[in-house]
A protein has these predicted regions:
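Short, charged, surface-exposed hinge/linker loops at domain edges
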Residues: 402-416
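Residues forming the ATP-binding cleft of Hanks-type serine/threonine protein kinase domains
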Residues: 364
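Formylglycine-dependent sulfatase
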Residues: 1-352, 356-358, 367-388, 392-395, ...
């Protein structure tokens, strides 16, 4: 997509998280984080250099993006991707926001303590907040009262790269909460709920800087008179669990991680405060953005432009199902390989590799996907229809047998052992 925009006279840039192999292609300018990036004093890669920059990643990405906007060639239209690390693991807030939500008790989801029935893969994952999070690395909990030494923390470099002054302020902000925790002597359900609160408070404090950064960019566009003719898109690459099923992270095809935020602004074209209820995917972004810009959409693009839908000229897309396929196994969180489709009402998933399990949900009757209906006789016609539709979608996307290769038993065994070693002794 950036190549197409550049070939049509646009200035193009990407700033922030890249997390792909190779250098960015099709961009006139790029300044990207190394790998996932670090929250504090991150390393930035440019065409001819890699340098560590003192500061907070979200603020730096915002500032670099504003600098590029101010220095761009104003005679050309532009395409800019601002890609934040936040709120990726391990949710380290800016120093000014560390204690932002200390006085708040966030409501935990009803499913925080789940009862999985006929959901084998959901039961066997390793992404439960109160079982699998590293208390030091993820929750910033200390090893004992009166010390700043962190509890389980297999990746010390996230904190070690802080300057002495940054670490001093960080420890001063977290020490009172950590000491108060050890005084409470929590166990069982109370401890599990406490860990959920720690996670949510850090997560929300981390995204506070994203909110500020987005606001600064929107303010700049308005101040320069660019807001009336600039499509602004706020989105992500997936959803995220904030305690649903007791989980953090993503990966599963269940709704909290399958759905993702998508906010768009283009005054005079997209009706204000309008809401669109159609099934879109991130592969639809490229054809949509190109059509908005009046650029021809290449015939080999698999996505569908939803321009006319967000403009309010159409209510439906030419799509009755969306496809999902998760391959990363054995890997972090040990979410089993699975694929499936979703329609307006139903969802079917097949978990495979070291298991063979189907799940089927009526999202109208069971939006939280608690009741796997795969064996329910009342739904066998719908299940048959969904399996046929799944086959046709896989044919459309040319899904090959190579994508169903199984992991070796040894690799799975080694992964479990490795994660157990990294987990260390939990606070119980």
């Amino acid at each position: 997509m950036p190549k197409i925009f550049r070939n049509n006279g646009y200035q193009t840039a990407v700033i922030g998280k890249w997390h792909l192999s190779g250098k960015p292609a099709g961009f006139d300018y790029w300044k990207i984080l190394e790998d996932q990036g670090k929250y504090y004093n991150p390393d930035f890669i440019t065409e001819n250099d890699t340098a560590r920059v003192e500061g907070y990643a979200t603020d730096l990405i915002t500032d670099y993006s504003l600098d590029w906007l101010k220095q761009r060639d104003t005679s050309k239209p532009f395409f800019l991707m601002v890609q934040h690390k936040a709120p990726h693991r391990n949710w380290m807030p800016a120093l000014r926001h560390v204690n932002k939500y200390d006085s708040i008790q966030f409501p935990l989801p009803d499913s925080y303590f789940p009862n999985f029935e006929n959901q084998e893969a959901a039961e066997e994952q390793l992404m439960t907040i109160y079982k699998d999070m590293y208390e030091g690395h993820d929750l910033k909990m200390s090893r004992a009262k009166g010390t700043d030494e962190l509890a389980s923390n297999p990746w010390t470099n996230d904190f070690d790269r802080m300057t002495a002054e940054q670490r001093k302020q960080w420890n001063a902000a977290y020490r009172p909460e950590n000491d108060a925790f050890w005084e409470q002597d929590l166990h069982g359900e109370a401890l599990a709920r406490y860990k959920g609160q720690r996670y949510l408070k850090d997560y929300m404090a981390t995204i506070a800087s994203v909110d500020e950064g987005v606001g600064k960019i929107l303010d700049y566009l308005e101040a320069q008179g660019l807001d009336e003719n600039t499509l602004v898109v706020y989105t992500s690459d997936q959803g995220f669990y904030l305690g649903e099923n007791g989980w953090f992270d993503k990966r599963f095809m269940y709704e909290p991680s399958f759905r993702m935020p998508l906010l768009m602004q283009l005054p005079g074209k997209i009706p204000q405060q309008s809401e669109v209820n159609v099934m879109t995917q991130n592969l639809d972004f490229a054809p949509t953005f190109l059509e908005v810009a009046g650029i021809e959409i290449p015939k080999d693009m698999q996505g569908i432009s939803f321009k006319e839908v967000v403009y309010g000229n159409k209510k439906e897309l030419d799509r009755d199902a969306i496809y999902y396929h998760y391959y990363d196994w054995p890997a972090f969180h040990m979410v089993k390989r699975h694929y499936g489709i979703k329609t307006d009402r139903y969802k079917i998933m097949h978990f495979y590799d070291d298991n063979d399990a189907w799940e089927f949900y009526d999202l109208q009757e069971d939006p939280k996907e608690k009741n796997n209906l795969i064996d329910n006789p009342k739904y066998q016609e719908e299940i048959k229809m969904m399996k046929q539709k799944l086959d046709s979608v896989q044919q459309y996307y040319n899904v090959t047998e190579k994508e169903f290769e199984q992991a070796s038993e040894k690799s799975i065994e080694n992964a479990y052992k490795n994660f157990e070693r990294m987990r260390g002794k939990p606070i119980e």
